Amino acid sequence: NLDAVDVDGAVNFAADVTYADGADIITASAGTSNFRAGVNAGNSIASGGNYNVAVGDEAGTAISTGDNSVAVGYAALSAVSSNSGNTAVGKDALRLTTGSQNTAIGHAAMELNVNGSYSVAIGDFALYNQNPATATNTYNVGIGKDAGISVTTGVQNTYVGGLAGDAVVDGTNNVGIGFEALSADHGSGETAVGVRALKVSVADNNTAVGLNALTANTTGASNVAVGKDALDANTTASYNVSVGAASLTDNTTGDHNTAIGSDSLANNTTAANNTAVGSSSLTANTTGASNTAVGRSALAANTTGSNHTAVGKDALLVSTAAGYNTAIGDSVLKANTTGNYNTGVGASALAANTTGDYNTVLGYQAGDSLTTSSGNVAIGYQALATETAYAENTAIGYQALKTNSGGYYNVAVGHEALLSNTTAQSNTGIGNDALRANTTGANNTAVGRLALTANTTANNNTAIGAEALDTNTTGGGNSAVGYAALYANTTASNNTAMGLNALKANTTGAGNV
């Protein structure tokens, strides 16, 4: 065993080992397994190079002629000749490579690597100015401290932490991942994952995922951002989509928006073709545009209007300042303010809409105490149940004009038709129980089934078919026309009847024909 040796001058111990004066162990060079250790370390290994390792001082000083390299300290792989496997570990690491399968690990890592190759660098200055202009294949990665420190000139990129893509020059397929992520990148495929994510991107096909996501991205492009502050004040917009947390947080300036959860279109500015899907959905979107919102608080106090559609939960929940509305389920136009071209559809439909306009509603509680009215039409179940404050009514099925209160140009079409409408006006009935015990009269017309079914309290009647003036009460201008015509009309007035049972046992008299 050789524990310690005091060498004065260079001494050759065997054909392949030299102790140099003032140096660490140095194996003889020339071919095959190679290992060297200090001062001029790999000092131009030749005879085909081979499995190299050189360790300190000027380390791989122009290894010739390549092979599986590793160099460890000081000037590490000092301008390798003729390429091969590279790996370098410290100080100036892959100092001016030129090329092949690189990996570098610390201090200046890929220090100004000449003509790239398959790259990876891990710490300190990481991909420190990698610079292909030919001989490329540069698949870059980065990993720590200054990670992609101004990659020149781009290619496949991936950076991981520290300042990640720190001022990338010049882009390509990027990914970012941590701390300042794609910090001032020069575009291309982009994707960044955490902390400052796409901080401050110089665009292309963005995607960012967490914390400040698209942090003030400039200038827009195809965006998607997923969490925390998502499209955090993205500038200047493009095709947005955002997914959670504060979603389109104060996005500036607009474009094709879509946001999906949490605060969704949270105060989006300045609008464009919105869609939002859940949680607080279009939360106080500013300023309007083509909206659609789908769940939870849907168009939650949208400001300022535009072409709405909302679909569930609180739907048009206190919309401000309206637009072409349509809402479809749950609380539908829930106390919409201020009106416009409304349409309802289900659950509580036009639930106390305020303030009116061209309404149309379809089911469940239909015109559910619509306020304050306008063009109305309602279609099913409780139809115009119980209208407030009147206007041009039309209702179509089941309880139709169910005790409409305040009347007006009424028409109702089926089943209970004008079911006890109050307080009348220009009525028309049409089917099933038609003017069923209408109250209080007016210019009536009813058409089929029980027609003027015990209309109360009369006015200018006309009936037409089925049981026609079926025990009309109380009189009026009467006319009847078919089937049971003036069927036991009570209590008379100016009668005329025409077919089948015409004045059928008319009671009690009056103008007859």
Regions found by a protein language model. Give the residues of each.
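Fibrous stalk/shaft segments of extracellular and virion attachment machinery
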Residues: 1-20
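Glycine- and small/polar-enriched repetitive beta-structure motifs of secreted/surface proteins
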Residues: 16-513
